Amino acid sequence: DRTIYEDANIFAPNLHAMGLMTNRDFSNYESLFELMERLVSPPDLLIYLRASIPTLVGQIHQRGRDFENTISIDYLSRLNERYEAWISTYTKGKLLIIDIDNLNIVDKPEDLGSVIDRIDAQIHGLF
């Protein structure tokens, strides 16, 4: 699931930059986010699944959701760039970045197991 941080740092700024959110609406959204951020604790561990555009496109096609079929490569690229910029400055808590270009956690239990092991190590430590 997405966090409130992604909406505020990636999706809303992207919509604003594309001219799909007015300055007033964007300002209101930022104010609401700042209020929410003071009331909600950050996650114990933020897991970022890093993927290239070809991987993202493949996953979208594999899911087969009608509403995702109209997503353009340009839009995906913009979001991916914003994700990379945001994640490089994330300081709210623990962060685990997993490159999923060469993983298949749906069909390969060993890939899923390695991801779970990495999550456990981040949350509970190595021992």
What are these regions (language model features)?
Residues 1-4, 26:
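Switch II (G3) loop of P-loop NTPases
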Residues 9-84:
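A glycine- and Lys/Arg-enriched "phosphate-lid" helix/loop adjacent to the NTP-binding pocket
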Residues 57-70, 74-127:
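NTP-dependent small-molecule kinase module
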Residues 4-6, 51-56, 102-105:
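Conserved nucleotide-binding/hydrolysis micro-motifs of P-loop NTPases
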Residues 1, 46-50, 96-97:
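Short beta-strand segments at enzyme active-site cores
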